[in-house]
Amino acid sequence: MAKRIIYNENARRALEKGMDILCESVAVTLGPKGRNVVLEKKFGAPQIVNDGVTIAKEIELEDNIENTGVALIRQAASKTNDAAGDGTTTATVLAHAMVKEGMRNVVAGANAISLKRGIEKAAGFLVEKIAENARSVEDSTAIAQVGTISAGNDDEVGQMIANAMDKVGKEGVISLEEGKSMTTELEVTEGMRFEKGYISPYFATDTERMEAVLDEPYILLTDKKITLVQDLVPVLEQAARAGKPLLVIAEDIEKEALATLVVNRLRGVLNVAAVKAPGFGDRRKAMLEDIAVLTGGQVITEDAGLKLETAKLEMMGQARRITITKDTTTLVAEGNEADVQARCEQIRRQMDETESSYDKEKLQERLAKLAGGVAVIKVGAATETEMKDRKLRLEDAINSTKAAVEEGIVPGGGTTLAHLGPQLASWAADNLTGEELIGATIVERALTAPLKRIAENAGQNGAVIAERVREKEFNVGFDASVNEFTDMFAAGIVDPAKVTRSALQNAASIAGMVLTTECIISDKPEPKENAPTGAGMGGDFDY
């Protein structure tokens, strides 16, 4: 296919145009008075969202080069979402502001490589400052505040997430389910999550989210590698007769046996899924035993004289619900409380006896998985469209609270970045020279972009608000919900430091890459040929 090659200014301008379109679409959602965006779907009802990364993923432009710009800035949002689970709109607005500011300097003749170096050094300084100004999260009030802000100022959601964290602990798991009622409810159950996903994507029952969900399944636990399909047949037949799904957790499943499971799943003979056992060596056996205790089953191991071909349903574990993604498996089981407590006690004793800090850490992980449990938030809404929107907001809120527990909280509403601008300017003046100093200035000017946009979405003059915030103390910012300046910590308007840090780092990374772009090579669109006459369906036939 023929290629289209664009150089210098034209290349950067085309990228910038794509970024402008994406940033404007995403930025309208920023802040307490941010609006929603409606996504048209080929199938099903339109989706109304307020989530930056979801909007960014939907945007595809006709022009290939502009689309490249969209893809680059989308990466800033996606990476921030992967690292911190929230802050995607902030990352997009920051990256766009840095690129805009940087373009002016490149056009004026500045060396793009030196600018990039300056941007990187400025980002490094700001990351340190964010960590310095972060407050650790000690009580559930702070957790509730973070959840409330992230869920779009929904106090009920913030309180619910704080309650969930109280019950399952900081190491526990909080998952989301679509509820059956109009109200959002919290349900805490025993459960466990481990970092192994399905072996084959064909096991996914929900292809949109790429998840496999098994309700009330049997669980086959074994520490051996399953190579022959004959080993599995007796168990598969028993599970099919019982009419329940089956989850196989084994060291590995070879091609032939795996193909049999996939075929059974696709033909609808048996709802089955397979995951590799978590951990390695002796720790794998211990974790399989943990799962067995939790689910009331047995590990089919030759050490205990048990073989797969003689396994009975009574030896299987059982769970209420199992959710498997490509990376994780979450088991929600009920009952067996006495056994679980005894197992937890045993792990605690092992922790007391061991002297290795690594072993202690791994035992602590196992204890958290066993004792922590899983909190399930059942999302309620009047319509399916509202349900999807609430679910996305809740997902952001849960990720934010976890990020806050990890690295602490900073003043929210774009306040932290705006206040760090003058500190960056004085540091850069002392430590950087020439075009590297200009690179740091690019970052410094971009730092007020999120605050300006929050103010503009609330109907205020962004530039004026940003200047007034910078004149005040570090914790004082602009509360766009009531159009007042206030102490952000006192008002409960806080952001997780991890979210702010990730947004800044990813924005700086993308901006540096775009500014150093000198040439773009893309496929030249082929002219569409007109279809020959009479080639449509139907032709000369009578029906």
Curated annotation (Swiss-Prot):
PROSITE patterns in the cross-refs: CHAPERONINS_CPN60
Residues the entry annotates as binding ATP: 29-32, 86-90, 413, 495
Name of the protein in question: Chaperonin GroEL 2
Enzyme class: isomerase
Catalytic activity, EC: 5.6.1.7
Species the sequence originates in: Acaryochloris marina (strain MBIC 11017)
UniProt KW Isomerase keyword: yes
Catalytic activity: ATP + H2O + a folded polypeptide = ADP + phosphate + an unfolded polypeptide
CDD domains: GroEL (cd03344)
GO cellular component terms listed in the entry, alphabetical order: cytoplasm
Quaternary state and interactors: Forms a cylinder of 14 subunits composed of two heptameric rings stacked back-to-back. Interacts with the co-chaperonin GroES.
Location(s) in or outside the cell: Cytoplasm
GO terms assigned for molecular function: ATP binding; ATP-dependent protein folding chaperone; isomerase activity; unfolded protein binding
Task performed by this protein: Together with its co-chaperonin GroES, plays an essential role in assisting protein folding. The GroEL-GroES system forms a nano-cage that allows encapsulation of the non-native substrate proteins and provides a physical environment optimized to promote and accelerate protein folding.
Annotated GO biological process: protein refolding
